[in-house]
């Protein structure tokens, strides 16, 4: 899937001068594939986060890990999926803070921008979901500083070289995902990237008691899964 599907799309996009982004391979545990390797085959690896999962799980950590391990400057995320009209800008900021802490530096807003009616509110949503980020929201006219702040955060997050303490090998047992019950206990105050066999073979080397990547990143420790 990583090479023949996403790799083929990447090649075709490059041949035509197109930037390729994809939520490779998505969140579903039924997809038997390597998400880190699949995300490495796109220009901008993308995950997603929802308000119902405020700690930033889903696959945004996989997206930032793929960006770090494979030397990509942008780790993208579908942001605020299914945010409700009851969510305030303060709620959205908290969600964005989690995403930035997980290494995301581009927010692709999940919204319902298409609002053809002038006399209907809340207007066009989507498939029974709120998708509240549109001009019919009561705080919309006051939100410009918030979006400018998010743009500035994303810009600053792309500068410099990420400093990550640990790298965690996800193994090869399906599903190859960042699953909390499989992860070792990460000490408080330390951050990690996840990687899989492809990166171990093609991207990593050992020198001076550290694990190095070609893009000048390094890790102080490699952690293996419990299984």
Regions found by a protein language model. Give the residues of each.
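Carbohydrate-binding surfaces of carbohydrate-active enzymes
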Residues: 1-227
């Amino acid at each position: 899937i990583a090479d023949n599907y996403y790799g083929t799309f990447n090649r075709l996009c490059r041949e035509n001068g197109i930037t390729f982004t994809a939520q490779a391979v998505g969140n579903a545990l039924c997809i038997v594939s390597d998400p880190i390797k699949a995300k490495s085959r796109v220009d901008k690896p993308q995950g997603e986060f929802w308000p119902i999962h405020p700690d930033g799980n889903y696959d945004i950590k996989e997206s930032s890990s793929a960006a770090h391990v494979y030397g990509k400057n942008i780790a993208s995320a579908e942001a605020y999926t299914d945010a409700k009209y009851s969510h305030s800008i303060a709620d959205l900021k908290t969600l964005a803070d989690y995403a930035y802490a997980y290494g995301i530096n581009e927010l692709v807003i999940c919204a319902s921008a298409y609002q053809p009616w002038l006399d209907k509110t809340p207007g066009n949503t989507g498939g029974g979901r709120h998708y509240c980020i549109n001009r019919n929201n009561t705080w919309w006219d006051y939100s410009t500083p918030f979006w400018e702040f998010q743009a500035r955060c994303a810009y600053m997050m792309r500068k410099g070289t990420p400093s990550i303490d640990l790298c965690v090998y996800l193994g090869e047992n399906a599903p190859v995902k960042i699953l909390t019950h499989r992860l070792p206990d990460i000490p408080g105050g330390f951050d990690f990237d996840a990687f899989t066999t492809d990166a171990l073979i093609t991207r990593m080397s050992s020198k001076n008691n550290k694990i190095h990547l070609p893009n000048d990143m390094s890790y102080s420790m490699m952690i293996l899964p419990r299984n």
